[in-house]
């Protein structure tokens, strides 16, 4: 009898003890409905919170900050499928996968804000050099779009000072007066299986949906110091679709004497573009291959020099080159299928435009020939020019089929 009374008295203590263990083993509850969850490499939940569909940024940013703390190693951040408004740019974190499968995020910033950015001084209080701001980050799936009425001329995604970043299967939609995504000072950054669609109030002069840009503080990539001359290297755009845009992917502007190195644009589909599908400016060791370009104003533009027009060329302030002027492109444009026609932005359609020459005007003095470029195996259907080239040296043009 005494043992029974002892058991009854101790039972609540035993239950409380086991409940405490259960809570300690699972510190965050799963939320029904809209939520964001952070799991570490073992699958343990390290953060979970409900997300307000009208203002998802606070909860999402807290999840990203949990990863950025570094306390849990490489993590996966998952958002419950649904549609959410982002009223402030969310700062991405290193060492994570952000899974947005089934998620639509709407850029609802009151000003020129974005949906996602890499860390910068405004948000972290730090300047970043080289490729140190964001590393080992994957953005998977999801749709990035604009809230109704947002015509503020802002990008959906801006990345700078970043390394080993992959954007996989994400849709970028309905940009007005800007780019869908911008990248500067990136190393081993990949856009694969992405969709870029819908663009208004832009012109051929500066309208790439995916802009591979220069890290210049005043006109092209403000708010991402340090401005240390870091260039893009090993950038890959593969198996993406670009449709109903002004321009597709590439670079307009240049630092004289600095180069975008190792850009690969492969296996993409471009259709119904008013301007140029692929723009290469100061590219070396580049590969442009197996792309399908249909109903566009121009297929591929490759510049090593431009003295006037829309391109911005930046020097050291006294008109001298930054770094060393390159004399070897070491690039190839091969096995592309291109169909071009006259558009509202391109009254003289061309399959390809390859441009080098002696500098004058904006460029420091020198010869910027297109040297050692291979253009072969391309099929071009055009209502205007086929392949137009200026100052091509030691280049190979072979087995290209042009139909008018």
Predicted features along the sequence, with ranges:
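Short glycine/acidic-rich loop motifs that flank beta-strands on beta-rich extracellular proteins
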Residues: 86-89, 107-113, 147-155, 176-183, ...
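Parallel beta-helix/beta-solenoid
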Residues: 99, 118-152, 156-175, 192-195, ...
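Acidic Gly/Asp/Thr-rich repetitive segments characteristic of extracellular carbohydrate-active
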Residues: 42-80
């Amino acid at each position: 009898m005494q043992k029974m009374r002892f058991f009854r008295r101790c039972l609540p203590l035993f239950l409380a003890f086991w409940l405490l263990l259960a809570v300690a083993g699972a510190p965050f509850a799963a939320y029904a409905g809209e939520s964001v969850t952070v799991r570490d490499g073992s699958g343990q939940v390290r953060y979970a919170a409900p997300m307000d569909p009208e203002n998802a940024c606070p909860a999402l940013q807290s999840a990203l900050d949990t990863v950025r703390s570094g306390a849990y190693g490489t993590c996966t951040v998952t958002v419950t499928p649904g549609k959410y408004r982002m009223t402030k740019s969310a700062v991405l974190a290193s060492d994570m996968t952000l899974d947005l499968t089934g998620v639509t995020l709407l850029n609802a910033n009151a000003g020129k804000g974005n949906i996602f950015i890499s860390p910068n001084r405004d948000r972290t209080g730090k300047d970043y050099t080289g490729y140190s701001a964001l590393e080992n980050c994957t953005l998977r799936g999801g749709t990035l779009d604009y809230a109704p009425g947002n015509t503020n001329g802002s990008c959906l995604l801006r990345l700078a000072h970043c390394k080993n970043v992959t954007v996989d299967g994400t849709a970028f939609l309905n940009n007005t007066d800007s780019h869908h995504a911008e990248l500067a000072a990136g190393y081993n950054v990949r856009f694969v299986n992405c969709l870029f669609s819908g663009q208004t109030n832009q012109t051929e002069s500066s309208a790439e949906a995916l802009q591979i840009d220069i890290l210049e503080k005043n006109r092209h990539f403000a708010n991402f110091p340090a401005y240390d001359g870091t260039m893009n290297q090993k950038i890959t755009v593969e198996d993406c679709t670009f449709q109903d845009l002004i321009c597709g992917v590439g670079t307009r502007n240049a630092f004289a004497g600095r180069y975008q190195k190792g850009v690969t644009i492969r296996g993409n589909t471009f259709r119904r573009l008013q301007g140029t599908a692929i723009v290469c400016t100061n590219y070396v060791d580049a590969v442009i291959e197996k792309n399908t370009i249909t109903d566009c104003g121009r297929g591929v533009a490759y510049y090593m020099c431009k003295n006037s027009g829309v391109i911005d060329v930046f020097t050291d302030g006294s008109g001298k080159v930054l770094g060393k002027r390159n004399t070897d492109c070491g690039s190839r444009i091969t096995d592309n299928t291109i169909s071009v026609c006259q558009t509202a932005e391109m009254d003289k359609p061309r399959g390809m435009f390859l441009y080098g020459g002696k500098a004058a005007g904006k460029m420091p003095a020198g010869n910027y020939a297109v040297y050692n470029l291979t253009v072969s195996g391309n099929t071009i259907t055009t209502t205007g020019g086929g392949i137009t080239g200026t100052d091509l040296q030691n280049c190979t043009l072979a087995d290209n089929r042009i139909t008018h």
